[in-house]
Structure formats: structure tokens, C-alpha cells
């Protein structure tokens, strides 16, 4: 049943990502749900299976499922920050790869709800650049705009949001007795949060 539920969430998450939010959907909440359905559900299944196969008390199953889902969301939010701030020589990726391909990220979604003229202009510049790249122009046309997005407050907000999801995951571990398992799961969540440093 666990595998079937996880597969269903993965498929729904991918379908929702492909189709995109509907007119009455909040794009930010929608994006978080996609992250939870995709990466979150995979890590949640692993932590839930750990409880089941280890013979641990069933009372640990739901908190550890939630822990895994929150870790997955935090991981993807941090990926959005890393996608903008990474150095090609460190990662082998050009910064902003996702956005250049037209894939929304949390910084771009947060930028889209900003109302100050500088943010509105930057969002429009990125949207136009994505359309031009899709039409065949060189992806480097977005280099300057993505550097400004990297330095924009919305990227820091995304990092703060990721850290909040990480802390939420760690808080779910309060049901576990103190010991090596709880410590290892705490370190795992913290190590994911530290990837952005």
C-alpha cells in the first residue's frame, strides 16, 4: 500500500507540475504541494518504511512520514536557491538552469507577487527572456536578470522558507526517544539545510 500511495502522489505531482496551477490556485501553495507530492513523498515513504520494517512503534509512523515530506520540500526549496547561486565550476550547471527552461522556482514565484516597480520589471524581464529562449535565442540573454534575482530579497526569503521547513521536519522527531536514530535524522535534515551555505 505504501508503494502504491507513493507512486500515486509522484504521478499526481508530475501531472500538476506539467499542467500548472489553475486560475483559482495560489501559485505558491500549488508549488509547495507539487514539491510535497514529488520529492516529499519519496523521502516520506523511506522514513515510513523505516518505521514499518524496523518494528518500531506504529505511533512513530505518521510523524516520520511528515518529517520525510518536510525534508523533501526543504530540499527542493534549497535546490531553487542553489540553482541561482551555484558556480558552474562547482556544479557543472549554468546558474538559473530551471528558470531558463521555463520551470518555475520559488524565487520566481515570490518575485511574481512583489509589487514594487523594480521587482515587477525584473519579473517581466525574466518572463520575456524565458519566452525568447523557448523561441530559440541564446540562454545567456538571462544572465544579468538571473544575477539580479539571485541577489533579490525573494531568494533570501526562499532560503528562510527552506530553513523553516527543515526546522518543521526536525520538530516532528520530538516523538522519538533521544538516541542515535533521532540524532541521525536530525543531522540528515540539518545537512540538507547546510548545502546552501
Can you describe what each PLM-predicted range is?
Residues 1-197:
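All-alpha prenyltransferase/terpene-synthase fold signal
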Amino acid at each position: 500500500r505504501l508503494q502504491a500511495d507513493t507512486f500515486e502522489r509522484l504521478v499526481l505531482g508530475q501531472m500538476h507540475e506539467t499542467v500548472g496551477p489553475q486560475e483559482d490556485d495560489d501559485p505558491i501553495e500549488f508549488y509547495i504541494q507539487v514539491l510535497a507530492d514529488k520529492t516529499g513523498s519519496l523521502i516520506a515513504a523511506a522514513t515510513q518504511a523505516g518505521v514499518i520494517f524496523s518494528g518500531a512503534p506504529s505511533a512513530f509512523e505518521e510523524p516520520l512520514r511528515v518529517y520525510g515530506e518536510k525534508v523533501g520540500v526543504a530540499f527542493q526549496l534549497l535546490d531553487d536557491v542553489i540553482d541561482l547561486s551555484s558556480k558552474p565550476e562547482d556544479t557543472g550547471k549554468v546558474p538559473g538552469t530551471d528558470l531558463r527552461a521555463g520551470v518555475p522556482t520559488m524565487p520566481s514565484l515570490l518575485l511574481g507577487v512583489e509589487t514594487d516597480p523594480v521587482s515587477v520589471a525584473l519579473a517581466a524581464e525574466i518572463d520575456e527572456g524565458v519566452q525568447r529562449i523557448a523561441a530559440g535565442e541564446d540562454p545567456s540573454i538571462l544572465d544579468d536578470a538571473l544575477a539580479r534575482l539571485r541577489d533579490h530579497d525573494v531568494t533570501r526569503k526562499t532560503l528562510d522558507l527552506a530553513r523553516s521547513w527543515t526546522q518543521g521536519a526536525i520538530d516532528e522527531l520530538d516523538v522519538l526517544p533521544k538516541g542515535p536514530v533521532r540524532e541521525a535524522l536530525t543531522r540528515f535534515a540539518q545537512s540538507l539545510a547546510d548545502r546552501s551555505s
